[in-house]
């Protein structure tokens, strides 16, 4: 996603906070001030008034940024005002500075996001030049990475299988000069990735491990994304209502690819590795079963108490592989548990971390970039809940308590050498909000991007 080049003729959009409205009205031409007062413009989020000249041409737009309380309750509020503007070129006029200005600039780009792959015709949209004072390249990299994440999640599973997910990673690598290796089907067993193979073997589309590498200097950062392109639940079949959104079960993979774009586009000084176990959890005669005991890459055995807890299985092999290189940090993203949604809802990305510095930095960064996260604990006392006795680990502890925590504890068993952070994301916007239409959405990636320079001492 790109800003309009500055050589285009543009209409000013004057974005006003509600608390500065009266002062601004006193500086406007009397006709414009009278018009704003007569039409009830208050500067609330979503308020918009168009000003035309005597010939009927649009010459100025006033857009509300809301009250302080409204801004706390609604991110990217400027997008609500600009989304309905006539097609054409615009530039922003505002007193916003710093992080607030960056958020507004990102809102201008994300307001133009549309997933129109399956529509006969697209729509002409308003476009903005980069606001003065922002890092244009950074905002564009973030918006483009977020758009990639959304596109991948929104694509239905019939067009987004393990192969298509691998192709998306390859295309991203070609853009940035990265390298990709893909291990497919029976080769997963040869490479000692048995859990990935087992979860995906029942599907007609073969499972894969996608391994992207970029960068030759700096700290080693490995991102691991759950790539379950569709989750039927396996033999523990999901009810229809629970299966309806399961095209988004590769939201973790989509998130790490979007974040990888941001990192590479900004040329961050890291040695980046992205690992994505890409599988479909299907039902067939060779599907894995409840009661099976499976072997993992790490050598730990796992008793299967629910085939619908498959995400942690494929992540386990990928995490074990990542840990063998002893990177400076491993971060996983996964649409892993319903318990996380019950705990914090769809907007917030809960995370777990063994690294206090990163955890503290991440919490601060999330507020700076309007990407809310919340830390949950690796609570050691719950370790016994994932130990069934007959095997080393249980993939689905009974009882229903602390589901997000027990899933994170399960994953932590496969990372011993490296500091580890895990995000349990939802990856879906259930209803439209400014700059976030209903559908796939990235969570936690922008916060992590903001935190990385301090956390990795870049």
Predicted regions and their residues:
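Short amphipathic alpha-helical segment within the helicase RecA-like ATPase core
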Residues: 1-227
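A generic structural signal for tightly packed, nonpolar segments enriched in small/aliphatic residues
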Residues: 166-458
């Amino acid at each position: 996603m790109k800003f309009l080049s500055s050589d285009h003729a543009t209409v000013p959009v004057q974005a006003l906070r509600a608390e500065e409205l009266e002062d601004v009205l006193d500086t406007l031409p009397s006709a414009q001030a009278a018009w704003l007062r007569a039409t009830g413009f208050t500067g609330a989020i979503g308020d918009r008034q168009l000003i035309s000249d005597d010939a009927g041409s649009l010459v100025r737009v006033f857009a509300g940024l809301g009250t302080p309380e409204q801004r706390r309750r609604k991110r990217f509020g400027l997008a609500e005002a600009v989304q309905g503007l006539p097609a054409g070129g615009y530039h922003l006029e505002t007193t916003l500075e710093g992080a607030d200005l960056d958020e507004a600039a990102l809102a201008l780009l994300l307001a133009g996001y549309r997933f129109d792959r399956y529509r006969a015709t697209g729509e002409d949209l308003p476009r903005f030049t980069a606001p003065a004072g922002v890092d244009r390249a950074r905002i564009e990299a973030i918006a483009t990475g977020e758009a990639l994440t959304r596109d991948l999640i929104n694509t239905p599973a019939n067009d987004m299988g393990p192969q298509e997910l691998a192709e998306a990673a390859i295309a991203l690598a070609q853009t940035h000069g990265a390298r990709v290796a893909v291990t497919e089907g029976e080769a997963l067993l040869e490479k000692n990735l048995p859990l990935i193979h087992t979860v995906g073997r029942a599907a007609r589309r073969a499972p894969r491990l996608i391994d992207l590498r970029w960068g030759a200097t700096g700290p080693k950062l490995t991102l691991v994304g759950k790539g379950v392109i569709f989750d039927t639940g396996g033999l523990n079949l999901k009810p229809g209502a629970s299966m309806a959104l399961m095209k988004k079960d590769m939201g973790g993979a989509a998130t790490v690819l979007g974040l990888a774009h941001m990192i590479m586009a900004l040329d961050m000084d890291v040695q980046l590795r992205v690992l994505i176990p890409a599988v479909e959890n299907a039902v067939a005669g060779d599907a894995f079963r409840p009661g099976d005991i499976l072997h993992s890459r790490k050598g730990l055995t796992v008793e299967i108490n629910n085939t619908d807890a498959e995400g942690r299985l494929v992540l386990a092999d990928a995490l074990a592989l990542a840990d063998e290189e002893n990177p400076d940090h491993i971060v996983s993203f996964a649409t892993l548990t319903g318990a996380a949604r019950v705990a914090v809802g769809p907007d917030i990305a809960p995370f777990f971390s063994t690294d206090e510095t990163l955890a503290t930095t991440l919490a601060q960064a999330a507020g700076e970039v309007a990407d809310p996260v919340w830390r949950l604990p690796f609570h050691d006392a719950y370790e016994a809940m994932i130990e069934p006795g007959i095997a080393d680990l249980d993939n689905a502890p009974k009882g229903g308590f602390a589901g997000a925590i027990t899933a994170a504890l399960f994953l932590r068993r496969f990372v011993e050498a490296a500091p580890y952070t895990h995000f349990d994301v939802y990856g879906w916007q259930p209803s439209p909000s400014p700059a976030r239409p209903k559908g796939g959405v990235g969570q936690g990636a922008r916060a992590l991007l903001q935190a990385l320079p301090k956390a990795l001492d870049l």
